[in-house]
């Protein structure tokens, strides 16, 4: 049975992309191509950028291209792994989120603290500060290395609108190679039919340009849409497997054309089972390989789509499978939608399909949502253990986690442990979370430290990020203490303490009596090495974007560059550039990518340039400056224009109603637009609101942070359920872990660790105070 293809490590993905593209240059570019790398003959460079046609003059194809760019921006589609936090996009299969954060903010603030996050970047569409410029007067000098920012923004905007020919004409007026390379990269990113040959030519001409997964995706899409020859397709994939649905389909067609029927069939089955794509490509696959896919393949695709709430794909797959599978889709959707007809839909599933994984999952979720976790646990106990039958073990784990926590709330630790431990999570981050939950329940509620130690050891064997490494070691120490192994416990705490920027690393340091918080930084890149770094086209392009104020487009290039770099000194230099460009969001991204790989870029990961100076309001209790930085980093990554789907705005992600109440409390005028246009105004109101929360919760940092994220009403419920962490008889570490909203649980830990680091960044004399912070407001 075909299993989902394993993805390449991020550190290798871009190099494989470049190798695959360059390896095919001899085939793809056997004929001559234009100087700019286009498929069409190149036109002589113009002395000045050519005036673009008006939008009204666009062809139908160009209009469609522009509309498609707005609907599905390739930048927003990039999954950027920046933080061991998983951004869940919905209700987490029943666990209600505290609130909805902006796409970028959710990368840090939501869900699982061990998952590499899918970090969708903000839309990189750039609106020029002025109308797209006309051709300069012929008497003016041609654009030189000092690229005109307005003209650069104009050319970028043309590519973003799908006006490739107009963009090319403007690009040809630039003489700076960095500007030309930047604009070609923008054209490829925009996905406006640039073509395979042009994409390959760009990589050939710029072998050191941070490639990223998008260049590969664009090339694979073009291989299929341009119907490239089997020889070219196979040459392209000689060094790297396909990473997209179009790429897999193109390779399957090429394999079959060359007589490799078995390999082609295997590729089609892998495509069908592991990739998400729409009706059009589905029809092409079925038309090209009518006898390859079986009912088992269709059922697998249906199950995967159901677990992703992709009802249309699931319905089509059920139709291909035949039988009564459509009833499973109806039942699954009714349960997920919390329909009043869910029970009837489940009852309508034929008895022959009630052993199907999808039915078991839906039945368990229905019972759990009906506040019957014991019955849900009994149903989960009948679930198959074969990962290929479960299809997506991670989604199954999420349901198990929610049921286990509900059972724990009922005091049934034994069953909660059974539900948590009998899991089949697939990805490392979910396996870490599952093993942690099983170990934590065993240690703190089921009285079985020996079993807990085994689970925490499994976490340690998988963990790579500082947060996960520290969490594993800290809890190994707690288990060892419970077993009476004091020396072993100390060794585990010392291991956790080696991660000083992670929450559990800081808690371990406090437990060991360590009061320092050492932040690491590499040596500077100097001399000829620094000159060579600064001279790279991609680095010069980043400077051009920064000087033109195009931060939205600079961010993905910073991230691609940070992924490609392995020398800490070069990463430090990249961060220095982001600092020069006053781009704290890029600094956070660069720093996180570095520290996730164990590289010493702690300071860059916690920038101090993101908040302008301001005078605080005196009508509310004051909070320390480090706390404002800790919150802003978690809420918006210092993006002053950030807006969430539910309306939270600005640097501090304040809801307008909350901001208005706070403004009234401090007797200042309220202007909702200033939340996103005036970062100092938003920071002042955010700090004032934090002061209000400190007052509400009598100085408790834990309760204030939880309330900032989830609201005071939820915090009151959690105090009723789990006790008051301000009282001495409640273990505050456990209290935070018992927060039922995964987003808020993670949020409190991340803000608490941010606070410790920012104290050190803003005042190097500051001692580690996390133990006191966790117990503030104690009575």
Which residues fall in each region the model found?
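TPR repeat positional signature
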Residues: 151, 179-180, 184, 216, ...
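Structural register within alpha-helical repeat arrays
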Residues: 154, 184-187, 219, 251, ...
């Amino acid at each position: 049975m075909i299993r989902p293809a394993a993805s390449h490590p991020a550190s290798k993905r871009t190099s494989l992309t470049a190798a695959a593209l360059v390896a095919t240059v001899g085939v793809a570019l056997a004929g001559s191509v234009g100087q700019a790398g286009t498929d069409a003959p190149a036109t002589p460079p113009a002395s000045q950028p050519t005036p673009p046609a008006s939008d009204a003059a666009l062809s139908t194809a160009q209009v469609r291209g522009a509309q498609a760019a707005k609907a599905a921006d390739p930048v927003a589609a990039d999954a950027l792994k920046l933080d061991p936090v998983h951004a869940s996009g919905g209700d987490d299969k029943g666990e209600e989120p505290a609130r909805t954060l902006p796409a970028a903010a959710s990368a840090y603030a939501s869900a699982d603290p061990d998952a590499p996050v899918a970090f969708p970047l903000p839309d990189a569409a750039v609106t020029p500060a002025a109308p797209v410029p006309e051709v300069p007067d012929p008497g003016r000098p041609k654009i030189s290395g000092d690229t005109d920012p307005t003209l650069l923004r104009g050319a970028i905007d043309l590519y973003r609108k799908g006006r490739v020919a107009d963009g090319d004409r403007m690009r040809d007026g630039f003489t700076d190679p960095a500007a030309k390379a930047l604009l070609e990269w923008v054209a490829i990113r925009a996905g406006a039919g640039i073509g395979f040959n042009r994409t390959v030519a760009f990589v050939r001409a710029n072998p050191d340009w941070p490639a990223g997964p998008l260049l590969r995706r664009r090339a694979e899409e073009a291989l299929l849409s341009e119907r490239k020859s089997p020889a070219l397709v196979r040459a392209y994939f000689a060094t790297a497997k396909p990473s997209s649905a179009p790429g897999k389909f193109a390779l399957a067609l090429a394999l079959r054309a060359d007589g490799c029927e078995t390999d082609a069939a295997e590729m089609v089955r892998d495509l069908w089972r592991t990739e998400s794509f729409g009706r059009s490509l589905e029809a092409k696959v079925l038309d090209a390989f009518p006898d390859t896919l079986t009912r088992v393949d269709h059922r697998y695709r249906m199950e995967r789509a159901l677990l992703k709430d992709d009802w249309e794909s699931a319905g089509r797959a059920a139709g291909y499978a035949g039988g009564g599978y459509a009833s499973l889709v109806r039942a699954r959707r009714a349960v997920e939608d919390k329909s009043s007809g869910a029970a009837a839909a489940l009852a309508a599933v034929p008895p022959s399909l009630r052993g199907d994984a999808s039915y078991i999952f839906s039945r368990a979720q229905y019972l759990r949502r009906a506040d019957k976790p014991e019955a849900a646990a009994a149903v989960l106990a009948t679930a198959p253990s074969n990962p290929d039958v479960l299809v997506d073990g991670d989604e199954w784990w999420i349901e198990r986690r929610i049921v286990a926590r509900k059972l724990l709330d009922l005091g049934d630790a034994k069953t909660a442990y059974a539900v948590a431990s009998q899991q089949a999570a697939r990805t490392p981050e979910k396996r870490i979370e599952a093993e942690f939950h099983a170990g934590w329940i065993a240690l703190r509620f089921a009285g079985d430290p020996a079993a807990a130690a085994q689970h925490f050891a499994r976490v340690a064997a998988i963990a790579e990020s500082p947060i996960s490494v520290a969490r594993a070691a800290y809890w190994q120490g707690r288990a060892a203490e419970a077993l009476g192994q004091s020396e072993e416990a100390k060794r585990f705490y010392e291991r956790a303490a080696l991660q000083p920027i992670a929450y559990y690393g800081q808690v371990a340091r406090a437990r060991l009596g360590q009061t320092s918080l050492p932040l690491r930084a590499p040596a500077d890149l100097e001399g000829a090495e620094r000159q060579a770094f600064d001279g790279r086209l991609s680095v010069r392009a980043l400077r051009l974007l920064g000087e033109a104020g195009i931060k939205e487009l600079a961010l993905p290039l910073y991230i691609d560059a940070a992924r490609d770099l392995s020398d800490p000194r070069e990463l430090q230099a990249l961060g220095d550039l982001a600092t020069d460009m006053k781009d704290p969001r890029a600094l956070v991204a660069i720093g996180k990518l570095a520290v996730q790989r164990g590289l010493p870029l702690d300071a860059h990961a916690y920038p101090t340039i993101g908040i302008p100076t301001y005078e605080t309001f005196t009508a509310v209790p004051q909070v320390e400056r480090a706390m404002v930085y800790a919150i802003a980093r978690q809420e918006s990554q210092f993006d002053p224009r950030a807006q969430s789907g539910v309306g939270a705005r600005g640097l501090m992600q304040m809801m307008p109603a909350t901001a208005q109440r706070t403004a009234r409390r401090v007797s200042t005028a309220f202007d909702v637009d200033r939340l996103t246009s005036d970062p100092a105004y938003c920071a002042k109101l955010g700090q004032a609101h934090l002061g209000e929360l400190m007052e509400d919760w009598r100085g408790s940092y834990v309760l204030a942070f939880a309330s900032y994220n989830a609201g005071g009403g939820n915090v009151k419920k959690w105090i009723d359920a789990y006790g008051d962490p301000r009282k001495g008889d409640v273990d505050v570490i456990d209290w935070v872990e018992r927060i039922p909203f995964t987003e808020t649980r993670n949020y409190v830990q991340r803000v608490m660790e941010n606070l410790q680091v920012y104290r050190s960044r803003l005042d190097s004399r500051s001692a580690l105070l996390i133990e006191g912070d966790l117990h503030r407001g104690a009575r």
